């Protein structure tokens, strides 16, 4: 199976960034940072994100985190 980005996984399920944030107990800004590679996603959040979207960790293509 081809890898899918965090944003694509979320959109595929019809969820908004706000809905993901609410369910994970983080801010919408954090979800945006994960999706754009501005912040590294901790494994526990990745697991929960995958559970919400129906994808496995192996299906997700995480963006490279920028060090700027």
PLM region spans:
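Short amphipathic recognition helices of helix-turn-helix/homeodomain-type DNA-binding modules
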Residues: 59-68
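Short alpha-helical DNA-recognition segment
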Residues: 14-33
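Residues within the helices of the helix-turn-helix
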Residues: 7, 18, 47
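Alpha-helical residues within the helix-turn-helix
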Residues: 11, 22, 51
């Amino acid at each position: 199976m081809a890898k899918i980005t965090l944003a694509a996984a979320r959109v595929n399920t019809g969820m908004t960034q706000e809905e993901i944030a609410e369910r994970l107990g983080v801010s919408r800004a954090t979800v945006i940072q994960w999706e754009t590679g501005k912040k590294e996603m901790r494994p526990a959040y990745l697991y929960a994100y995958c559970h919400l979207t129906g994808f496995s960790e192996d299906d997700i293509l995480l963006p490279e985190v920028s060090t700027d």
